[in-house]
A protein has these predicted regions:
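Second-shell loop/turn segments in exported
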Residues: 28-37, 79, 83, 110-111, ...
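Acidic/His/Gly-enriched intrinsically disordered linker/tail segments
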Residues: 112, 118-189
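Hydrophobic helix-coil surface modules that form long, contiguous segments used
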Residues: 1-94, 123
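Loop/turn elements at helix/coil->beta-strand transitions in domains of secreted/extracellular proteins
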Residues: 18-21, 56-62, 98, 191-196, ...
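Active-site-adjacent bridging/hinge elements
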Residues: 18-19, 70, 95-100, 148-163
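Amphipathic alpha-helical substructures
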Residues: 172-230
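Active-site-adjacent structural elements in folded domains
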Residues: 63-65, 84-88, 162-171, 184, ...
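Zinc-dependent metallopeptidase catalytic helix centered on the HExxH motif
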Residues: 37, 79-143, 200
Length: 230
């Protein structure tokens, strides 16, 4: 517990001109040394980027609370670790608020298809991080050894497996990094960013507040790009 909480807020500029507010609550102990004093900046930048790039944020407020959990998201409110600083605080903030798009706006079934939740979110997080403050916190996905484990380890279950059918130690690779990297390859090496981004925006637009399956995603991208993804 803390003797005092700091409340900070800033206007979020949405493409349509609608109003939204970034609101942060954190204990005074989390302030300073590139800590939570930048939290409102992070939330504002994250939501403005996703709103302009993909689909407008639908809620009148975006609340982040410093807490004793590493990161947990709900519509319009997130809880992030009170000890996080710098790139770690940006990363968890951007990730948890990214979940407002997947699976809040696009309501895929995260219990069956985790890659359509965590994987899609991890994918858009990297693009957001590249654009934030001229890439202040952008890093590569990891070492060659990490990528080998994430992409080519023969002991990994299929990405399409449900989380219940994955070994717990594999969930990070299968739900987050492998699908995110696959989308990156699809965007940058196969389709091209310009065409892919148009198709991905259309996918979000078509399936906003609905419950798409993997086939719905594949079909939408194929229809919008004219490419066969088989």
């Amino acid at each position: 517990s803390s003797a005092a909480f700091i409340v900070d807020a800033a206007k979020i500029n949405l493409p349509s001109g609608k109003k939204s507010l970034a609101l942060y609550l954190y204990p005074e102990e989390s302030n300073g040394n590139n800590g939570w004093e930048r939290s409102t900046e992070y939330t504002k930048a994250s939501i403005e980027h996703y709103s302009k790039k993909w689909y407008e944020y639908p809620y009148p407020v975006a609340v982040n609370v410093a807490s004793n959990v590493g990161g947990m998201e709900y519509p319009a409110i997130s809880f992030c670790g009170y000890k996080a600083k710098g790139g770690d605080l940006w990363g968890v903030t951007d990730h948890e608020f990214g979940h407002n798009w997947f699976p809040m706006i696009v309501g895929s079934n995260e219990r069956l298809h985790a890659w359509m939740d965590e994987g899609f979110n991890t994918f858009i997080n990297e693009i957001s991080t590249i654009h934030f403050n001229k890439g202040e916190y952008h890093r590569s996905y990891g070492t060659k050894n990490f990528l080998t484990q994430a992409l080519f380890n023969p002991s990994l279950e299929p990405v399409m497996s449900s989380p219940q059918n994955m070994r717990e130690r594999h969930i990070g690779y299968l739900a987050y990094y492998k699908p995110a990297y696959a989308l990156r390859i699809l965007r940058e090496e196969i389709i091209g960013p310009e065409r892919f981004d148009v198709a991905f925006r259309k996918y979000i637009e078509y399936w906003a507040y609905k419950h798409p399956t993997p086939n719905d995603f594949f079909r939408t991208i194929e229809n919008e790009t004219g490419e066969n993804l088989n």
